[in-house]
Amino acid sequence: MDVRSAEFTKYAANAMLATRISLMNELANLADCVGADIEAVRRGIGSDPRIGHGFLYAGAGYGGSCFPKDVRALARTAGRFGQELLILRAVEAVNQHQQQLLGRKILGRYGDDLDGMHFAVWGLAFKPNTDDMREAPARVLLRQLLRAGATVAVYDPVAMAEAARTLALDLRADELARVRFAAAPLDALAGADALAIVTEWKAFRSPDFGKIKAALKQPVIFDGRNLFEPEAMDEYGFEYHGVGRGSRLAKDAPSSAPRAPARRAVSQHAGSLTRA
């Protein structure tokens, strides 16, 4: 492969992966409206060998340095040649919208004025196993919550020092004063009105739900990475808001399509509260 094609391949690969993520996020948002479960949809379409399972997880949007940078770089390069990459423009627009999803869900649940409310946020880095905060969805969520008047307690297994540095640049002094950097996941929950999960760290996948419930003022979880099964969370007494897991309102609405006899949903692994 020649050098120019090799360089193009690197950018094209990241653009393709970003496109898969944004498409799944669009489908997840529609699934919430119609009462479908995007996790079931993911498994279904991923079983098609033409598609595969990689990068089909819906969530709170992508971040980091590579995907955003490479998508924009390809679009800018196309512009210099008088071309417009419409799909990649849409991929970026969808991702920017998706990074605001958790904030919209929280504001939709509690109203636009969050003065006097306190939220716990688990996960600050843009993905697990790094402290990289570049274009991390958590930064968007924190700005939304703080500018609506809330206070927050944040925790990340690795990114706390980098988060402190980054948020000092992101936030106004009065906003930063309403951020507490917690020492542990449960420490972040103390007195919170709800928990928001933004990064899919392994440490968050199998928590002690009894302790979570005891620490929160109300058992409410906004899960931006679909770590848990809605049916199991309901059995444990949590109000659970995932991404594309199908709202109760939509599920209760009549469908024009014939429906199979109802069957009790189970978690993806017997006895497990977490996804595969």
Model-predicted segments: where are they?
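Structural/interface elements that position substrates and couple domains in central-metabolism enzymes
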Residues: M1-A276
